Amino acid sequence: MNTSQETLERLAAELRKAEGKGEPVGPLRDVIGATNVEHAYAIQRLNQAYAIANGRRLVGRKIGLTNPKVQAQLGVDQPDFGCLFADMAYGDNEVIPFERVLQPKIEAEIALILERDLPSASTTFADVIAATGWVVPALEVVGSRIEGWNIKFADTVADNASSGCFVLGGPARRIDGLDLRGATMRMSKNGEVVSSGSGGECLGNPLNAAVWLARTMAEFGEPLKAGDIILTGALGPMVGVSAGDHFEAEIEGLGRVGVSFSVDVTEVLK
């Protein structure tokens, strides 16, 4: 599908407007095509450039669609990536305003914090291990600027891989001795377990996902740098979020991470 630069810029602006107004838009695939990866990433990069030009600080990347259960939920069959900005980060057990993310859902992940650059498009598993400074449990709050989560691959890629915000837990651990592949995850919502899985559900190993990201970012000309945060992907199914919810995830060998969402004041006043 032949799409002009002007059209890509218009679609990027529509996504920004959707987030700013809290009003989702229709699927972008109707314009760019459901599988047009090039145009989808072009839209994402336009909004990345806009964000940076307006003072937002890029602090890492998220990998999406690494878990077969999540892929099945969204009807896609390959990973993608999106940007993490400093203003998307929340502290462990902090309260996130419910309106912060459009149509929010949440998933538990393993996060890596790099201490070395990963500049090569032929990055190996060993390279990622050597470059990783810290490993922490994380929660990612995903959201969609596309109405009703009616998305295909091109929609979520253009929409910054459906990123919303994220929470890092602790304690921060060194990677040596950790079994990230075998680590089990249990996530509870208001005290009830609602999602479970393991590191093996994230492209077979969360480090495989990080290798994929390092190679992909090098190919894009934006290689991963020391200090970058990598959200390696969901360890189990994502779960819907309602105002007032509290979530807690425990990842075997890593620790715990929690977050709460504010009560919807408009509902309380009704």
Curated annotation (Swiss-Prot):
Q: Which UniProt keywords apply?
A: Aromatic hydrocarbons catabolism, Lyase, Plasmid
Q: Give its E.C. classification number.
A: 4.2.1.80
Which GO terms fall under biological process for this protein?
3-phenylpropionate catabolic process
Essential cofactor(s): a divalent metal cation
**Which Gene Ontology terms of cellular component type are present?**
cytoplasm
Record's family?
Belongs to the hydratase/decarboxylase family. MhpD subfamily.
This molecule's function is given as: Catalyzes the conversion of 2-hydroxypentadienoic acid (enolic form of 2-oxopent-4-enoate) to 4-hydroxy-2-ketopentanoic acid.
Q: What name is this protein filed under? A: 2-keto-4-pentenoate hydratase 2
Originating species: Pseudomonas putida
